[in-house]
């Protein structure tokens, strides 16, 4: 197999000489969840005042809609701290929700009409109004239902000691180039092998029929009352039905280097869309979208993984990358895990540690658009029918195929080696245990999250009943939780500080909204 590497063992040996490397990974989690009411319907209330400003609270914000909460952990180097902080955020949030609960799945609860989905509001400042207008554009382009599918994003970075082990001493410019090159190698391998993530952790094999709202689909759904499902699906969220973007299929953004990526991204932001132009940009004094290009802003680019750098104030994501190179990567392919109150488990985090480290240490040849399309087709197969035993996946574009099971076992042969090294560094066997558990799932699709969830839905009679049962139990667990890493005082201080920050931003505005937008998009001219 050309794609499963030649140099992995040699690189692993280099890194393993400093066991501290494996204790210093940087991790952060962003978890989305819909607020819902007693009857299992989407909440139509505004963002709770007790959570502060969604615009400036660093831990608790909103995504597309007022009802779509997003929790953001600080960067942590310890898995227990990471998940403990996420627990604490859930606890505090639930204390501010009254009778409302947090929906425990990726696919939304019952939504009668799109009119029930209120766009997220962030205040009266120009930057806040721009965030809401961007969402107005998404609503008009793709519909609101697509935007309230929830996910979990996993942010990950290697410590400086990792790069020291592989490359020795370097100048600042050399190190920046080394990191970017390696992270893009990781990204290419993620496209090649990352279908393992929806296979194991996809948890959206079914949806409420209200989600379609009369739209046609070519997927051969089966019905269980008002629940639609695909018997072998893993992640409808990652399918064409979910949050992907067919309008972006014309884009050719490459991942062979940071320069190639930024060039493709810049072109996408400047490419006009005849389809989106029909929507209008400003009609009768009211904005309908930020602009009529294929992407309004960079965030609109759909991707299962993104190269990232923390931006300075006023800096666009691409400008941050151009300035300092890749700092970390954001994994965006995780469905909400419905079997835990916080949407992600320790086993998942350990697998991601292993998989992302393996992807970075493995050989990663350049990838043209043809090869990228072939790998994307593998992803499409896995999300729609990944639990079909013996499903054949393509190996690149040369016609060779291999079963999902055979390919996964080849990857795990190297993941096991890595797990042993990482366990040795930590003085336990937790990575090996996670590896062993998931390797059993390869030959037993019924153990995957999507299979477990579909079984539960069939037992309960519907997705709605299952979501309400789990969500009700998690509400009680969240309320009973005791702070482990944050404190009530810290959470309340952040709420108060967020309100002050929002007010300061609003008072600092010096131009009207039209001028603000013109200045923001001046770089497109």
From Swiss-Prot:
Documented EC number(s): 6.3.2.2
GO biological process: glutathione biosynthetic process
Pathway the protein contributes to: Sulfur metabolism; glutathione biosynthesis; glutathione from L-cysteine and L-glutamate: step 1/2
GO CC, any one term: cytosol
Keywords linked to the UniProt accession: ATP-binding, Glutathione biosynthesis, Ligase, Nucleotide-binding
Top-level taxon of the source organism: Bacteria
Catalytic activity annotation: L-cysteine + L-glutamate + ATP = gamma-L-glutamyl-L-cysteine + ADP + phosphate + H(+)
Entry GO MF terms: ATP binding; glutamate-cysteine ligase activity; metal ion binding
Stretches that traverse the bilayer: none
InterPro entries per record: Gln_synth/guanido_kin_cat_dom (IPR014746), Glu_cys_ligase (IPR007370), Glut_cys_ligase (IPR006334)
A family per Pfam: Glu_cys_ligase
Family: Belongs to the glutamate--cysteine ligase type 1 family. Type 1 subfamily.
Name used for this protein in its record: Glutamate--cysteine ligase
Organism: Vibrio vulnificus (strain CMCP6)
Lineage: Bacteria, Pseudomonadati, Pseudomonadota, Gammaproteobacteria, Vibrionales
